Every structure is written in structure tokens, then in C-alpha cells.
Amino acid sequence: MSELQTLTAETTAAPTSAVSIALPLVLIADADPQSRLRRSRQLTDRGFRVTVARTGFETIVKASCHLPDLILVDGSLGDRGVQETSELLSRCPATAHIPIVRLSPGRRLTSRVLAVASAAR
């Protein structure tokens, strides 16, 4: 599979309609392609819209452009550390309001996302 096909498969979204526009958008930031794809599928299967980033720089750009409702960060982001990326997002007025959740192994992803989504209501 080419890099473009992989990125296209990873950047999935619920079907566009008047109803889906209001669905929460989650940005998954993770350098591991299999992890990004797995988490993306978990969330889209539950109705979330999803976009993905592979690096800290890409996370900052996509967060600024798409203004997701939540950013999930896992592992290393390659060019920037998770801490540096989070700090830059927190300092930017356009992205400072977006919750950032750092994922850790052993916890169920969807449970944590649903908990954050419920708390935001």
C-alpha cells in the first residue's frame, strides 16, 4: 500500500450529511501507522469524525486548520515531543481550547473518549 493510500485510509470520516456535521471531530496524533488506523476505526465505528497526524508539526497544522473537538496523542511524534506539541497547541489562541488527551497503554480508547465527550456537554 502506498503512503498516499495509507494516509487516505487513515483519514476517515463519518459520511457527510446534515446530521454528521455536528458529530465530534477527533484528531489522532501518533507516529505508528497501525495504531492510527486501529484507533481511527474504533472511533469512526462509534460515529466520531476522525483525522490523523503522524508528527508534531502535522498535529499543530491539522489542529489549526480543522479545530477538532479533541486531540488524542500517543507515543512519539517524531519531529517534536508530545510535551512540546501540547505546549504549542495550548499557547495558540485558535487551539488553546481543544482538550488534549495523552493515551497510555492498557486503557480502552473509546471509554476515555466517550468520558471526555460526556464531560464537555
Locate predicted features:
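Non-catalytic signal-transmission and effector/linker regions of two-component phosphorelay proteins
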Residues: 1-32, 93-94, 106-121
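His-Asp phosphorelay/catalytic-motif detector in bacterial-type signaling
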Residues: 23, 67, 93-101
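Short beta-strand elements of ligand-binding domains
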Residues: 30, 74, 99-105
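Two-component/phosphorelay signaling modules centered on CheY-like receiver
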Residues: 33-51
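Acidic, metal-coordinating helix/loop segments flanking the phosphotransfer/catalytic sites
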Residues: 52-70
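Short amphipathic alpha-helix used as the core "switch/output" element in two-component signaling
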Residues: 61, 83-96
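Conserved phosphotransfer microenvironments
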Residues: 73-89, 105, 109-112
